[in-house]
């Protein structure tokens, strides 16, 4: 049982997932700080210091904190937009690298061209035999 667990726990996919979760949590903290400490105060200045967190409806001793809910939705939208922009920039950078790699492919040598022609001729011969 222990050996099976070790095989499972140390597979590449599991370790990749663990690293992704840790990095994702750290990135989430960065984005949350961006929203809380930079974007929200700037929007507060633009919107005249609007703060939804204090909005509530009180029924006796119970309070419905709908302002916090609105603020949470607002934070989510900002976080989602920030992550979207990050992923968009990341994808653009990786696609440029892939394009550069494709451009770096060398021209086929004479031997490779001849081997390709032989392959094509063999395919033609095999397809004509199949038809007959």
Swiss-Prot record:
Chain ranges passing through the membrane: 14-34, 38-58, 69-89
GO molecular function, one term: mechanosensitive monoatomic ion channel activity
One GO term describing the cellular component: plasma membrane
Subcellular location: Cell membrane
Topology with respect to the bilayer: Multi-pass membrane protein
The keyword ATP-binding appears for this protein: no
Keywords associated with the record: Cell membrane, Ion channel, Ion transport, Membrane, Transmembrane, Transmembrane helix, Transport
Pfam annotation, one family: MscL
UniProt cross-references to PROSITE patterns, sorted A to Z: MSCL
Keyword Transit peptide: no
Assembly, per entry: Homopentamer.
Function: Channel that opens in response to stretch forces in the membrane lipid bilayer. May participate in the regulation of osmotic pressure changes within the cell.
PANTHER family, alphabetized: LARGE-CONDUCTANCE MECHANOSENSITIVE CHANNEL (PTHR30266:SF2), MECHANOSENSITIVE CHANNEL MSCL (PTHR30266)
Recorded family membership: Belongs to the MscL family.
HAMAP family: MscL
Protein name stated in the entry: Large-conductance mechanosensitive channel
Annotated organism of origin: Bacillus thuringiensis (strain Al Hakam)
């Amino acid at each position: 049982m222990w050996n099976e667990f070790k095989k499972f726990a140390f597979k590449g996919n599991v370790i990749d997932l663990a690293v992704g979760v840790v990095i994702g949590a750290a990135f989430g903290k960065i984005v949350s700080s961006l929203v809380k400490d930079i974007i929200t105060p700037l929007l507060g200045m633009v919107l005249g210091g609007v703060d939804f967190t204090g909005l509530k409806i009180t029924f006796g001793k119970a309070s419905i904190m709908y302002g916090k809910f609105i603020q949470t939705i607002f934070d989510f939208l900002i976080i989602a937009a920030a992550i979207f922009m990050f992923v968009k920039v990341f994808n653009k950078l990786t696609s440029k690298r892939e394009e550069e790699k494709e451009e770096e492919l060398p021209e086929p040598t004479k031997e490779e061209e001849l081997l390709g022609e032989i392959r094509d001729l063999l395919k033609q011969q095999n397809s004509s035999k199949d038809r007959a």
